[in-house]
Amino acid sequence: MTDAREKGFWTGPLEMADPELHALICGEVERQKKTINLIASENYAHQSAMEACGSVLTNKYSEGRVGERYYGGTHWVDRIELLCQKRALELFGLDPDVWGVNVQPYSGSPANFAIYTAVVPPGGRIMGLDLPSGGHLTHGYKTKTRKISASSVYFDSRPYTVGSNGLIDYEGLEKTFTDFLPHILICGYSAYSRDIDYKRLQSIAGRNGAFLFADISHISPLVASGLMNSPFEHCDIVMTTTQKGLRGPRGALIFYRRAVTKNGETVDLDARINFAVFPMLQGGPHNHTIAGIASALLHAGTPEFAEYTRRVVENSRELCSRLQSLGLDILTGGTDNHMLLVDLRSTGVDGAAVEHMCDALGISLNRNAIVGNSSPLSPSGIRVGTYAVTARGFGPEEMREVGDIIGGVVKLCREMTGGRKMSKADLHRVTSDARVMGSEQVLVLRRRVCALAEAYPIYE
């Protein structure tokens, strides 16, 4: 019989087996090394988590729950999943007799849909923060003319908003809730820089026995470290992704009270949540990812990680202060977490122009809709986060330098555009123009970016 090894069945290292793909990955490695990453939803995963994700665990199917699998040979992956669950509950100080956690969701969006599927009837009512106000797509986003997210297609969604100051309008929220009477009230946001009054939201949700669900994907490390209010005291269900502040692989955790009482009836959330994840929406869990999450959760429970989260907030506030000193407007006037939203309307440039020019200079951030914008595709703001740069080692001094660079980019964009909105093609032409990119103003900014990136290397 022919030896499969002789035919390359086992392929060998990526560099040898697929040099084309290897070269592309190496290109991304170099980009990450040379780029200042200010995207609020990104971070640098722990090397141990990446090692687990590249392990033989990817070979194993294990549909079902621990002890209730549909496959044999799950002894080791069962132990890994139990370890991940244990560490997740411990990180937030949760009593396992009161709280359960499902660690199988592939990422945050399907986790959210699983939650709705578990507790909201088909066509039932969900209520979350509007996307231009800082909510997430999966919280029921739709426009006046089109349903965008599946959460607005399969459920009846109605948004609440922030006020003109950028803060959640709790009075308006309460009025909308009373008019709409949703089955689930969603809090926790993707572009909101302030803390959340979970107690007040619990009081509102209790009016008709609605479930209160917190999506803390952006702020879960800050909650775990005690730097932000905890939703666990007041919410029925809590979800977080694992790749942002937790520095794990892409996945999600759904925490749920094992049983809750709604309108006089006991609801078995343990059964509902787990059944919604599997078999309703998913098949076999990604065991390699669960192992990577378990490793990240171990790190997240250390004093060193608590210090990291403290520095994340410190850096965010330092950057906020610097940008304000340069005359830039910050939505809500400040920040309580890892992100800030810069309102560019007074500068004469939009978020797309700043994002595009920053990208050309080696800074990653994203355009972001702010209150009053009609479309997230043509926003008036940018969202800036400090998880990744803090993991890299940046401190207050470096954040002031980052703020000065962003201020320089805004000034450059204003000079380039003359206050007019530019199309994506126009922006591409500008950043491809050797005269523009070779100007002294641009070269100085690029050198400053390179100096910061070189001073704080990654994965060495």
UniProtKB/Swiss-Prot annotation:
Keywords, alphabetical = Cytoplasm, One-carbon metabolism, Pyridoxal phosphate, Transferase
Copy the pathway line from the protein's UniProt record. Answer: One-carbon metabolism; tetrahydrofolate interconversion
Q: Which reaction does it catalyse?
A: (6R)-5,10-methylene-5,6,7,8-tetrahydrofolate + glycine + H2O = (6S)-5,6,7,8-tetrahydrofolate + L-serine
The protein's Enzyme Commission number: 2.1.2.1
A Gene Ontology biological process noted in the UniProt record is:
tetrahydrofolate interconversion
Q: Which cofactor does it need?
A: pyridoxal 5'-phosphate
Q: Which Pfam families match?
A: SHMT
Q: Name its cellular compartments.
A: Cytoplasm
Q: Which residues carry this modification: N6-(pyridoxal phosphate)lysine?
A: K244
Q: Does the keyword Transferase apply?
A: yes
Task: Write down the superkingdom of origin.
Answer: Eukaryota
Q: Which GO terms describe its cellular component?
A: mitochondrion
Q: Which PANTHER family match?
A: SERINE HYDROXYMETHYLTRANSFERASE, SERINE HYDROXYMETHYLTRANSFERASE 1
The record describes the protein's role as: Interconversion of serine and glycine.
Q: How does it assemble?
A: Homotetramer.
* Record-stated family: Belongs to the SHMT family.
Listed name of the protein: Serine hydroxymethyltransferase, cytosolic
Name of the gene = SHMT-1
